[in-house]
Regions:
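N-terminal mature ectodomain segment of secretory-pathway/periplasmic proteins
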Residues: 42-117
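Short amphipathic beta-strand and strand-loop transition segments with alternating hydrophobic
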Residues: 151-157, 210-212
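Boundary at the C-terminal end of the N-terminal hydrophobic targeting segment
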Residues: 25-27
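Surface-exposed, polar helix/loop patches in the mature regions of secreted/periplasmic/lumenal proteins
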Residues: 106-146
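N-terminal secretory signal peptides and thylakoid transit peptides that target proteins
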Residues: 2-18
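Solvent-exposed coil/turn segments that connect beta secondary-structure elements
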Residues: 66, 84-86, 94-96, 109, ...
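Gly/Pro-enriched, hydrophobic low-complexity segments
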Residues: 120-123, 136, 140-143, 161-256
């Protein structure tokens, strides 16, 4: 075999390898990005837990958020939440009086804040802090079934209640948390506890669903305790009041409509 033919073979082999390796890398990357098929039975349980936390119909509720530091109560805020389905929400600030008139508008996963002193709405992320341990998405979007792919991770007992432990993986980076560890009652899907994680895998906060009472036609948690996992003693307590199912027209959930409220 001549030196020229050997060189040509080496060139062709290198050229083919240069084409093949990127193609294989792309295929592996596409496989990694492919959505994981969730067990329909597990998805249904998350949907039922969502429906226990909030009505599936349009509704209105008021939420009082009290922030604590090492057991000492700090500031408190009151919000009115109007929600139409899973994708349209308005969060109005009622108290303190100095912030009255501020409003959050969520459509899908797009979120804007409206402030009386600013002429144009400002785009926000669901993960940004609203107050204390509460992120914007904790009030504006609570659709675990739509935002996360669930998987059964095991079973545990929470305060004497047999519970399923679910791992919820974010469907994309636009949701509030990258991952949620979620405990729901095995018997009736009541939400019991949740751990919220950052994209890095760091535990951000721990939440407990408490004080189940009848609200808007069924028994729901009326108290949510959120503890900072990074800074001990920092706690926010959310109390849900005056929850009512009501008709909310879609025209309410627009930037133009909220501008008229300013």
């Amino acid at each position: 075999m001549t030196q020229r033919s050997c060189s040509r073979r080496h060139f062709l082999a290198g050229f083919a390898g240069g084409l093949l390796l990127p193609a294989l890398a792309r295929a592996a990357d596409d496989a990694a990005k492919a959505p994981v098929e969730a067990d329909p039975a597990v998805v249904e349980r998350v949907q039922r837990a969502d429906a226990i936390r909030f009505p599936r119909e349009s509704f209105q509720t008021e939420i009082v958020v009290r922030n604590y530091s090492n057991g000492v109560e700090g500031d408190a805020r009151t919000f009115r939440v109007l929600s139409r389905g899973n994708d349209n929400t308005i969060v109005l600030t009622l108290e303190p009086a100095t912030e009255r008139g501020q409003a959050l508008l969520m459509r899908g996963r797009d979120l804007w804040v409206f402030m009386p002193s600013v002429s144009q709405p400002v785009r926000l992320s669901l993960a940004q802090r609203l107050t204390g341990q509460v992120a914007n998405g904790d009030l504006a979007r609570a659709n675990f079934a739509g935002d996360y792919t669930p998987a059964l991770a095991g079973k545990e007992t929470i305060d004497g209640t047999p519970a399923l432990v679910l791992d919820l993986a974010a469907v994309d980076r636009g949701v509030t948390y990258a991952r949620v560890r979620y405990w729901i009652a095995e018997a009736d899907n009541r939400p019991l506890k949740a751990e919220f994680y950052a994209l890095s895998g760091r535990l951000l906060k721990v939440a407990r669903y408490e004080d189940f009472r009848e609200l808007a036609g069924r028994v729901r948690p009326t108290r949510l305790v959120m503890e900072d996992a990074l800074k001990q003693g920092e706690v926010s307590v959310l109390t849900y009041e005056n929850m009512n199912v009501r008709d909310l027209p879609e025209r309410m959930f627009t930037r133009e409509y909220l501008r008229r409220l300013q």
